[in-house]
């Protein structure tokens, strides 16, 4: 079992239940899924870029990503309908908790000029999104083999009813929010 999943079930559930004033342990918010998205607009010009992006996302997530394709043609961006322009992967279960562990303990502290995560990135329903400017913050990416620095979006979907519950859940997991 993943370290954070074990920690959540044995310690955080009871702590969050009292902290949030909930009656039933089934009301305690959990993390449902984590979605990683990497937009690769340059892939329209060069197909190799998409391969490198897919390899990076596979290494980070530990799971094969799905190629996202453009929905319509946009002349200004020089893309056509159906061209590959990104990649995404959805993590659930043990892989999700293992990724979250690596994100909190290794990747976030390695971000350059890091001063804490913004607490304003909640969507109103307890879900949190953050963007990373460099994929090299993750230990799975070998800096020497990277063709270019790419960012990625990370969306954490929770069962929280509001932002306060979501913030309490992520803070309990150890997310370094700005004070």
Swiss-Prot record:
It comes from the Bacteria. Belongs to the universal ribosomal protein uL5 family. Part of the 50S ribosomal subunit; part of the 5S rRNA/L5/L18/L25 subcomplex. Contacts the 5S rRNA and the P site tRNA. Forms a bridge to the 30S subunit in the 70S ribosome. GO terms for biological process: translation. One of its GO terms (cellular component) is ribonucleoprotein complex. It comes from Francisella tularensis subsp. tularensis (strain SCHU S4 / Schu 4). This is one of the proteins that bind and probably mediate the attachment of the 5S RNA into the large ribosomal subunit, where it forms part of the central protuberance. In the 70S ribosome it contacts protein S13 of the 30S subunit (bridge B1b), connecting the 2 subunits; this bridge is implicated in subunit movement. Contacts the P site tRNA; the 5S rRNA and some of its associated proteins might help stabilize positioning of ribosome-bound tRNAs. GO terms for molecular function: rRNA binding; structural constituent of ribosome; tRNA binding. The lineage of its organism: Bacteria, Pseudomonadati, Pseudomonadota, Gammaproteobacteria, Thiotrichales. Gene3D superfamilies: 3.30.1440.10. InterPro entries: Ribosomal_uL5 (IPR002132), Ribosomal_uL5_bac-type (IPR020930), Ribosomal_uL5_C (IPR031309), Ribosomal_uL5_CS (IPR020929), Ribosomal_uL5_dom_sf (IPR022803), Ribosomal_uL5_N (IPR031310). This is Large ribosomal subunit protein uL5. Keywords: Ribonucleoprotein, Ribosomal protein, RNA-binding, rRNA-binding, tRNA-binding.
């Amino acid at each position: 079992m993943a370290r954070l999943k074990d920690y959540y079930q044995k310690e955080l559930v009871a702590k969050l239940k009292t902290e949030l004033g909930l009656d039933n342990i089934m009301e305690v918010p959990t993390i449902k899924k984590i979605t990683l998205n990497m937009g690769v607009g340059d892939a329209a010009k060069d197909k190799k870029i998409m391969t490198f992006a897919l390899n990076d996302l596979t290494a980070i997530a530990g799971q094969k990503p799905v190629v996202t394709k453009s929905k319509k043609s946009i002349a200004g961006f020089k893309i056509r309908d159906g061209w590959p322009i990104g990649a995404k992967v959805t993590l659930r279960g043990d892989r999700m908790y293992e990724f979250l562990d690596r994100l909190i303990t290794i990747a976030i502290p390695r971000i350059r000029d890091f001063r804490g995560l913004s607490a304003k990135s909640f969507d109103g329903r307890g879900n949190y999104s953050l963007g990373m400017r460099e994929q090299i913050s993750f230990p799975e990416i070998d800096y020497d083999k990277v063709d270019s620095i790419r960012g990625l979006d990370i969306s954490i979907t929770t069962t929280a009813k509001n932002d306060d519950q979501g913030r309490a859940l992520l803070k309990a997991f150890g997310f370094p929010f700005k004070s």
